[in-house]
Amino acid sequence: MVSGVTYLKRGAVFGSGAFGTALACVLAKKCESVSVWHMNANEARVVNQKHENVYFLPGAPLPANLTFTADAEECAKGAEIVLFVIPTQFLRGFLQKNSHILRNHVVSRNVPVVMCSKGIERSSLLFPAQILEEFLPNYPIGVIAGPSFAIEVAKGMLTNVCTAAADINMARKIQRIMTTSDGSFRCWATTDVIGCEIASAMKNVLAIASGALKGLGTENNARAALISRGLLEIRDLTLALGGTGEAVFGLPGLGDLLLTCSSELSRNFTVGMKLGQGISLEEIKRTSKAVAEGVATAEPLERLAKKHNADLPICHEVYNVLYANGCAKRSFKKLNSCKLADEGLPALPRTSKM
């Protein structure tokens, strides 16, 4: 049993996709009741009747103390922690419509707010927590990041993630709330918020590259090289944007990158496999219920890298394949034909121990 964890009366989750549902299952172990916001009222009723999110996470029974609702205010009322798991490109629209609910029911009671969405907003090049900060200025916002396939989280399989906040005490507060007493979902605290968000966004793009390698028929050596070099791209952008680098070689960076780049449970990896096999992005979109996050992230990531003069060759080639009529085979040939260089790169700055 894990000591020092915190229990609450009520939790709220905005976003009912696979990961939002999975995190709600975790909260249900820590709260007397949990409410999940789902945009479709009829579907919310079906989920409550079946005790299963048949739309986004079939095969994972939902706890009895977890309910879905299409009423955002009902979801927020009385919550002692609020998680956001709304897709990044739709986050701003939700907040424009519902931020008054957060101010009335969350900010006024100093409730912890945790961003769990991943990606980069196309219009602003902001990360999810930065978008939320525009609507809740000067309010402490946490982030959850790390290797966590939704179905495994929902079924209580062993998972470790990071909780991040600018104030380490807030990160630790969220850590105590989200960590389950049986240790099946365990959190580690950090202050490298931007590092967590960058890693969470970039690993999806890099997973497309890894899947494309698989689709082209390569084996483990090539994937290991891609993961290693991809990790350095995460590091370079993190340092360019002012992160400490603490998250890069931990759970949000290395951990999530290894998971997402190595399993067909990852939608991003699967999209990459299909691209490597010569299937067009249009055909993939047409035959898929949900598009992988990395597809939406690759384009704003390309612009963000240029803005900060960050050299991200692997991510750049993913962008070329997705949006510039590139070919996966030619892209990898180009990457493997680049100018010879030293492996030794500047070390990460030292960070204080947590």
Curated annotation (Swiss-Prot):
GO terms for biological process: carbohydrate metabolic process; glycerol-3-phosphate catabolic process. This is Glycerol-3-phosphate dehydrogenase [NAD(+)], glycosomal. Pfam families: NAD_Gly3P_dh_C, NAD_Gly3P_dh_N. It catalyses: sn-glycerol 3-phosphate + NAD(+) = dihydroxyacetone phosphate + NADH + H(+). It is found in: Glycosome. One of its GO terms (cellular component) is cytosol. Its EC number is 1.1.1.8. One of its GO terms (molecular function) is protein homodimerization activity. Keywords: Glycosome, NAD, Oxidoreductase, Peroxisome. Substrate binds at K118, R267, N268. Belongs to the NAD-dependent glycerol-3-phosphate dehydrogenase family. The active site is at K203 (proton acceptor). It comes from Trypanosoma brucei brucei. NAD(+) binds at G15, S16, G17, A18, F19, G20, F90, K118, A150, R267, E293. It is an enzyme of class 1 (oxidoreductase).
